[in-house]
């Protein structure tokens, strides 16, 4: 947490020390709110074994960008989503407790120093978590686990217009994962554990407007650790070198605007972290729902 505080202190110093009221540009703001609901229901006399269900997902995506001075540009991206599935028993037709279907809390701040060179230095901070950890049903844990990533290096904008941007960056990164682990389900006791590692990070962001109704966004994150705080604990086990593998997080979204408030979105995500699973994890969501743009 001290490293997080130091990052923001340095960023604020650059922002306010180098900016001037004459030069400062206005904020570029974008906030989208969305709600998707799917519902099936059957009467008690219905035959065939079908059961009713209700699935809902609420989301909020926002981007705040500002040029504080001739050389300092700051961009904060936040993505929040949470959804549940309510299912009905096939025999009794009673509704079971809802289960979580979607959960995401992702905030990233990127500060670039535009020196009019081939590449621009940058500092970045990213916070990743979920609203509810439901891995142990007996013990509710909120905003768990927490992943903090601080990085710095060089970046380059390969393509940029008013509605399109392709930006890549490469740098050194430090990660800390703070986990509230359950030690006693009866007494509902937990303890806080944390691990840290450091290595090299590559992030590429793509934002393209394909037409007045279709847009595409993509984010590819690659991370290769050079050291791991728990390496001694896994030494001599089959998992000894798992932490050295490259972690992958690739997100893609195609969004189609049907009308002012109705939107269709296809989202898929590919994750690979050998410490969690030897196989890649894939998620795909096709949604039709309401979207409201605040800005």
Show which residues each predicted segment covers.
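Outer-membrane beta-barrel "beta-signal"
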Residues: 282-295
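Repeated loop/turn-to-beta-strand initiation elements of outer-membrane beta-barrel proteins
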Residues: 72-74, 118-121, 161-166, 212-216, ...
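Outer-membrane beta-barrel proteins
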Residues: 61-70, 108-117, 153-161, 204-212, ...
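Extracellular loop and loop/strand-boundary signature of outer-membrane beta-barrel proteins
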Residues: 45-50, 92-97, 135-142, 186-192, ...
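Outer-membrane beta-barrel transmembrane domain signature
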Residues: 165-257
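Surface-exposed strand-loop-strand hairpins of Gram-negative outer-membrane beta-barrel proteins
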Residues: 38-59, 88-98
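Transmembrane beta-strands of outer-membrane beta-barrel pores
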Residues: 35-41, 80-86, 127-133, 158, ...
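Membrane-embedded beta-strand positions of outer-membrane beta-barrel proteins
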Residues: 31-33, 76, 123, 152, ...
